[in-house]
């Protein structure tokens, strides 16, 4: 063994030893992971994510993956010649769009992630299980309504978003059954819900992750994004903030665009029983491991 290889071995051992207190903290705890962004479409990054999810399972953590798929849906709609329209960051979903969204989310993406996890965990028999919120009526949903002011009359008008929904009830029993099984399963959830009348709805993946994390009383919810975390007015990373500070960031306008719904869902999750939510860069290799098993973490932690 060369000196360089030997030093690398000692460094690895040191890292593992330093991680021991954190491994014990998360032993048999549920961690909900919102997996999305452009990194999800990169095969090498997807393989690293799957391997890290398997490692979490083998270290005693109960990971639950909720995935998005906006860019993939947009590409499929473009191929089908269906135009996409967005209101407040939500895709207006008519019948044709809903059919494509469910096919992409519950079919292609969901099964691909579950398969990567199963391949990564093959030697230890860790298996990814792909589900949508329709399975076992895990996610009961209702239609989302939005209003906006008419520029001419300044009157609030209802905007029809089509088959865009929001969770009204979460039944976590099927997930809990998988997590407590003798086989090491990792549930992978597509953000599709169903109404009490049987209507299918497309739901924002951040919203689903927050609702599931609350129902499962998860210790952590990790929101993997394309940025380092939440930034302050000067563009610097905020390492930790309270729910009150997160609200203030929204109200002041410092948080804008896609960060607003992420913060809103993080606030909702914490207020519904999740110990803390972390927004972090999912493009960085092993970001989840650094966040959970090191002193300083890897993103912005939001707690009470």
Swiss-Prot record:
It is an enzyme of class 2 (transferase). Its EC number is 2.7.2.8. One of its GO terms (molecular function) is ATP binding. CDD domains: AAK_NAGK-C (cd04250). One of its GO terms (biological process) is arginine biosynthetic process via ornithine. InterPro entries: AceGlu_kinase-like_sf, AcgluKinase_fam, ArgB, Asp/Glu/Uridylate_kinase, Glu/AcGlu_kinase, NAGK-C. It is found in: Cytoplasm. NCBIfam families: argB (TIGR00761). It catalyses: N-acetyl-L-glutamate + ATP = N-acetyl-L-glutamyl 5-phosphate + ADP. Keywords: Amino-acid biosynthesis, Arginine biosynthesis, ATP-binding, Cytoplasm, Kinase, Nucleotide-binding, Transferase. This is Acetylglutamate kinase. Pfam families: AA_kinase (PF00696). Catalyzes the ATP-dependent phosphorylation of N-acetyl-L-glutamate. Substrate binds at residues 69-70, 91, 202. Pathway: Amino-acid biosynthesis; L-arginine biosynthesis; N(2)-acetyl-L-ornithine from L-glutamate: step 2/4. Its main location: cytoplasm. Belongs to the acetylglutamate kinase family. ArgB subfamily. HAMAP family: ArgB. PANTHER family: N-ACETYLGLUTAMATE SYNTHASE, N-ACETYLGLUTAMATE SYNTHASE, MITOCHONDRIAL. GO terms for cellular component: cytoplasm. The record marks 34, 262 as: Transition state stabilizer.
């Amino acid at each position: 063994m060369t000196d360089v290889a030997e030093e690398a071995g000692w460094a690895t051992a040191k890292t593992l030893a330093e991680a021991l207190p954190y491994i014990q903290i998360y032993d048999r705890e549920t961690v909900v992971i919102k997996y999305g962004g452009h990194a999800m479409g990169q095969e090498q990054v997807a393989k690293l994510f799957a391997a890290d999810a398997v490692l979490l399972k083998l270290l005693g953590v109960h990971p639950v993956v909720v995935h998005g798929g906006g860019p993939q849906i947009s590409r499929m709609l473009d191929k089908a010649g269906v135009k996409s329209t967005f209101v407040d960051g939500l895709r207006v979903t008519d019948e044709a769009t809903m059919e494509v969204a469910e096919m992409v989310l519950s079919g292609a993406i969901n099964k691909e992630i579950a398969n990567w996890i199963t391949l990564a965990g093959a030697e230890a028999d860790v298996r990814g299980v792909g589900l949508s919120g329709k399975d076992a009526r895990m996610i009961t949903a209702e239609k989302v309504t939005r209003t906006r002011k008419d520029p001419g009359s300044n009157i609030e008008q209802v905007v029809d978003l089509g088959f865009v929904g929001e969770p009204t009830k979460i039944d976590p029993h099927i997930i809990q059954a998988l997590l407590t099984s003798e086989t090491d399963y990792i549930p992978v959830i597509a953000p599709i819900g169903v109404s009490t009348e049987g209507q299918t709805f497309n739901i924002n993946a951040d919203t689903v992750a927050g609702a599931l994390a609350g129902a499962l009383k998860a210790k952590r919810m990790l929101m993997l994004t394309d940025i380092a975390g939440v930034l302050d007015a000067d563009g610097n990373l905020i390492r930790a903030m309270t729910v009150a500070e997160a609200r203030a960031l929204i109200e002041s306008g410092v948080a804008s665009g896609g960060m607003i719904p992420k913060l809103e869902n993080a606030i909702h999750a914490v207020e519904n029983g999740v110990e803390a939510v972390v927004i972090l860069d999912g493009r960085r290799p092993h970001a989840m491991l650094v966040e959970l098993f090191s002193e300083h973490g890897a993103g912005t932690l939001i707690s009470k």
